[in-house]
Amino acid sequence: LVARYPSIASPLVILARGYSRELPGNTHAEANALAKARTLSPERLSEMFPSAEEETPRGPDIDDVLAHTDVYTTLEPCSVRTSGLAPCADALVAAKVPRCFIGVGEPDDFVQCEGAQKLRAAGCQVVWVKGLEEECLSAARRGRQT
């Protein structure tokens, strides 16, 4: 998750990173990154975004920060979870993430995915990163349990 907060002119800040199965349970990268971002204290957010206090006396709020955050992901955010957990696309929509950069679509042998469509329908700009598809798919398959 890369934040552009409080304004588009502010420097980029890496808010959180995540990878599949990083946190307990059958967790995915986007959900893990969001969960980790939500653990940032108000003090830490103020350190990361000092100019936010000029715009908001209370300092940055994680929901405001996420609404100015770009997501970079190797694999299309899932739209269906066979584990019963919430799909990553739904979590990104709930966080009001405005833009998602995706390295490769989820292959049919994983699950039928409509993550990019869900994001677009919610007003999130989806950017397909060209030229890294094979590397992204290879990374996704390495972590896949068959």
Task: Give the location of each predicted region.
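Short beta-strand scaffold segments in enzyme catalytic cores
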Residues: 1-10
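Zn2+-dependent cytidine deaminase-like catalytic core
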Residues: 14-137
